[in-house]
Structures are given as C-alpha cells and as structure tokens.
Amino acid sequence: MKRYVLDANALLDYFGDRPGKLRFAALLKEAAHSEQRLFLSVINWGEVVYSIWMKRGEATARQMRIAISKLPIEIVPVSAEDAFEAARLKAIHKLPYADSFAAALASRERATLVTSDPHFERLGKQIPVLWLR
C-alpha cells in the first residue's frame, strides 16, 4: 500500500491553480479508488487554513475547510513524541516549523512526502519526496 504525507503547499497548489495542481489531482483520484493513503498533519492543515484565510478571507477559509474534509485525506493529530521528532528535524535540517511536522509524519509513517517546497531538499534522501513542481 502506498502511503503519502502531504505538505501544506500540496493543498495550496491544488486549490490555488498552481503548477502542482494536476499532479496532486491525480494523486487524489488514485487515493479515492485504491488502497493508497494520504495523510496530513493537523499542523499542516492549520497552515493551509491560515494561508487561505490571510489571502482570501474567512469565508473562503471556511469553505476550504469543508472542501478538504471531503477529500480522501486523513488528518493526523500531533503527539508529544511527534512534536519532539519535528523539533529534532527542524534543529538538524533548519526546516520551517510547520514543514518539520510534515517531515516527522512522513518519517513515522514510512511514507513519501508530497510537496513543491524547496525547503525539503535540505533532508537529502532521508525521506522520499514526490515533487509537485
């Protein structure tokens, strides 16, 4: 079974008609019709909502919240152990805070990280990445 962890910008690409949209749409379609699993840390979910709220306003952020809930994506809560691993990855690789949670979740789930964010190049080959660029 394929397992993917979504970085916030994967969803922002999708909802924002950015270059990664078509590749991410194909991933969503595959997840809806297969055993493939898509995970999103609640931290990265909050990052998506915040980004949309700041760019398009509260009403649009609330609509996106509903739209995301209808996608074949599992929103994953964060434990203290997850936060520790995210802090470790942030300290070692100098990742932005929210990005470190996506990386920690991908590591824990032995999943491929889905992103178009160049910050994740800092991980080297530690975590497999599906680039949406």
Please provide the spans of the model-predicted regions.
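Anion (oxyanion) recognition and catalysis
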Residues: 32, 69, 107
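A generic structural signal for short hydrophobic patches within well-formed alpha-helices
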Residues: 11-12, 45, 120-121
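Helix-loop "lid/cap" segments that line or gate small-molecule binding pockets
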Residues: 51-54, 72
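Short, flexible helix/strand-to-coil boundary loops that buttress conserved ligand/catalytic motifs
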Residues: 15-16, 52, 90, 124-127
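Active-site neighborhoods of divalent-metal-dependent phosphate/nucleic-acid chemistry enzymes
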Residues: 74-114
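Short, well-structured N-terminal submotif of metal-dependent ribonuclease cores
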Residues: 1-40, 53-66, 132-133
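Acidic, PIN/NYN-like endoribonuclease modules and their adjacent C-terminal/linker elements
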Residues: 1-3, 75, 103-133
